């Protein structure tokens, strides 16, 4: 657990206990899947707009927390007896939580259509457009550039420090509009540039569907 290992005042995550069909507590066997979504900034609003669609299929909670704060909150809640089957998050926040999570984590990943939509929106704002993605840039980006003969500056990041550096580099090169996840758009706007949010309701919906399916499969195998 990284910096938490060996820290006496911070408890480790409790171990998951598996039950067979005969011994599994009735509440666990019959309840809906429980999903916790950890997000920051604009992604919170997107999650809040989609989660009501799943009210009959799962118990989904949204936490406005990220990185160490999210890990600590989840640890404390689980030690207090709260149950959760799957985490959902995105980008660097999701990657960090996944490294420490005792349950599966599903990442909210922008679709090819999300990339094309966001770039088209950015191009309406300025011809000086850049995109910063978590990890490798989607293949659709190159297709978009070739199709329209556009020069779009692109960068990738793994950590928040990378994200800050990438956006600053783009703005120093005259980029006026930056496309990316909420962390990227927040940085761009703080630097006086326009930000276009990359994620969509469709991407969130897909991640929640996958999380619910993972929870159902895991409980069936317990």
Where are these regions (language model features)?
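Non-catalytic structural scaffold of enzyme domains
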Residues: 7-222
């Amino acid at each position: 657990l990284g910096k938490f290992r060996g820290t006496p005042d911070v408890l480790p995550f409790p171990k998951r206990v598996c039950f067979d069909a005969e011994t599994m507590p009735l509440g666990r066997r019959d309840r809906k899947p429980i999903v916790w979504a950890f997000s920051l900034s604009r992604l919170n609003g997107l999650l809040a707009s989609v989660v009501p669609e799943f009210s009959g299929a799962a118990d989904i909670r949204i936490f406005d927390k990220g990185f160490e704060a999210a890990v600590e909150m989840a640890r404390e809640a689980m030690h207090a007896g709260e149950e959760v089957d799957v985490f959902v998050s995105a980008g660097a926040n999701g990657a960090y939580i996944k490294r420490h999570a005792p349950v599966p984590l599903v990442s909210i990943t922008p679709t090819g259509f999300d990339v094309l939509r966001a770039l088209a929106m950015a191009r309406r704002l300025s011809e000086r457009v850049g995109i910063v993605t978590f990890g490798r840039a989607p293949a659709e980006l190159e297709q978009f550039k070739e199709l329209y003969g556009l020069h779009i500056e692109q960068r990738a990041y793994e950590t928040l420090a990378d994200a800050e550096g990438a956006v600053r580099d783009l703005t120093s090169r005259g980029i006026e509009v930056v496309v990316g996840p909420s962390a990227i758009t927040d940085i761009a706007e703080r630097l006086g540039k326009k930000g276009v949010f990359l994620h969509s309701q469709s991407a969130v919906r897909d991640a929640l569907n996958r999380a619910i399916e993972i929870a159902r499969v895991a409980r069936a195998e317990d």
